[in-house]
């Protein structure tokens, strides 16, 4: 869905991943990029570039919980001409999902229920996202989708 990200993309093999990384490095070199950039590629044709995001990335939250060094820290390191940090991931998968709610609602009750149900869930109050890391994709999907549905009021348990 548009409200869910899975990192790394399921089904992507190491050759495809390496091709995308090399393309990104080539683009960065061609334009003299200093800092970080997010490249969005087509899920069906990974060589088809959909968007280049120079500012706050759409998928930046996943890196805060799923990567040794997150997007924002990497950007700061690059701008300050410091060595970049490890891009190693913490688990096999990181899932994030946007949360839909009334902007005037009290988030305390949903957070209390969801955090008690699964302490592994991580919430970003600013971007209204939930995230979780692990190795079982099906279980992670179930957790994130349940959280989104509960938070939005679609379900009440």
Q: Model-derived features: where do they sit?
A:
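Internal nucleotide-binding/catalytic subdomain
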Residues: 1-45
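Residues in flexible loops and secondary-structure boundaries
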Residues: 1-3, 12, 60, 70, ...
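A short, polar/proline- and glycine-enriched secondary-structure boundary/capping micro-motif
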Residues: 2-5, 16-17, 59-64, 140-142
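Short, low-complexity, polar/charged sequence segments that are solvent-exposed and flexible
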Residues: 10-14, 58, 68-72, 114-121, ...
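Active-site "cap" helix and flanking loop/linker of ATP-utilizing ligase/carboxylase catalytic domains
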Residues: 19-38, 53-102
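Contiguous C-terminal substrate-recognition/catalytic subdomains in enzyme active sites
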Residues: 45-46, 65
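Protein kinase-like catalytic core scaffold
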Residues: 48-51
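Peripheral (often C-terminal) accessory segments that flank ATP-dependent C-N-forming ligase machineries
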Residues: 77-157
């Amino acid at each position: 869905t548009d409200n869910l990200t899975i990192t790394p993309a399921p089904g992507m093999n190491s050759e495809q991943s390496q091709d995308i990384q090399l393309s990104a490095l080539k683009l960065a070199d061609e334009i003299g990029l200093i800092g970080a950039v997010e490249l969005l590629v087509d899920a069906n044709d990974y060589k088809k570039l959909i968007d280049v995001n120079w500012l706050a990335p759409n998928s930046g939250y996943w890196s805060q919980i799923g990567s040794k060094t997150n997007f924002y820290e990497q950007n700061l390191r690059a701008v300050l001409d410091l060595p970049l940090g490890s891009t190693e991931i913490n688990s096999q998968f990181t899932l994030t999902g946007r949360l839909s709610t009334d902007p005037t609602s009290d988030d305390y009750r949903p957070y209390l229920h969801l955090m008690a149900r699964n302490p592994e869930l991580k919430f970003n109050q600013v971007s209204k996202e939930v995230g979780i890391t692990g190795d079982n994709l099906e279980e992670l999907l179930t957790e994130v989708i349940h959280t989104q549905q509960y938070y939005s009021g679609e379900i009440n348990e």
